[in-house]
């Protein structure tokens, strides 16, 4: 390929990235929620060292901070860190967060998906770690161009338990 072709390809790539970056914004979400315990997803035939399920009927609360990128004010992709408290059992969670707002109106539905890891300091030595998966649906209300509030609920599976999260949050 000659120099002209290289310059044209470089120009096209720069224009594509320039257009893409102009529609991306750094964004932060802060959310809190109530986690209503439903049931254990695993049933255990107890052995001599078994100390009980990771969560045994405990409801919880959490506080999450998520840093990410908004793309075209419809898609949000981020990484989050959360504090968990299940009736005295403390823990941390780390997760990836994907959110979709289908409409660009002031009031719009939202779909949220989280995948990650949670660790609880419970009755087991050094606590227990487990995968985390959450699917939520809710409503997003745009207060200003850069400030949204939202509420959502759905299903959360972690620590061998199924929970119903009811969350409220703010995005800026």
Map each language-model feature to its residues.
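Bacterial Sec-dependent N-terminal signal peptides
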Residues: 1-27, 172
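Residues that define the transmembrane beta-barrel architecture of outer-membrane proteins
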Residues: 24-26, 57-61, 90-94, 107, ...
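Gram-negative outer-membrane beta-barrel proteins
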Residues: 36-42, 85-89, 104, 119-123, ...
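Repeated loop/turn-to-beta-strand initiation elements of outer-membrane beta-barrel proteins
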Residues: 26, 74-77, 105-109, 141-149
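Residue-level signature of outer-membrane beta-barrel architecture
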Residues: 69, 100-102, 139-141, 170-172
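Glycine- and aromatic-enriched membrane insertion/assembly motifs of diderm outer-membrane
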Residues: 43-104
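Transmembrane beta-strands of outer-membrane beta-barrel proteins
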Residues: 29-33, 80-82, 110-116, 152-154
